[in-house]
């Protein structure tokens, strides 16, 4: 199962866990997802974050909705930084889920409650 391959942890001590930060003004939601906030992640052709995805699962929804995906196709300093900003509109509460993919260490996840 895919769920058995996705790793998680505390982003303050694990450089692969995506950090989710959001601001909500009315029904407009701005979400920033980054990898390596406390402990920088390498960005070389040999070891890098390939992509980040953000999902929103409304409290009354059956399935999460893919808000967006950002692929990082350039690797080496100073070309890319594993950080993405997403905007969407909702009046609903729910969960924000982020996935990131490290080419060596696989899939990583995090989640926060959207109020």
From Swiss-Prot:
The keyword Zinc does not apply. GO terms for molecular function: iron ion binding; superoxide reductase activity. The keyword Oxidoreductase applies. It catalyses: reduced [rubredoxin] + superoxide + 2 H(+) = oxidized [rubredoxin] + H2O2. It holds the Pfam family Desulfoferrodox. NCBIfam families: neela_ferrous (TIGR00332). Belongs to the desulfoferrodoxin family. This is Superoxide reductase. It comes from Pyrococcus abyssi (strain GE5 / Orsay). The gene is sorA.
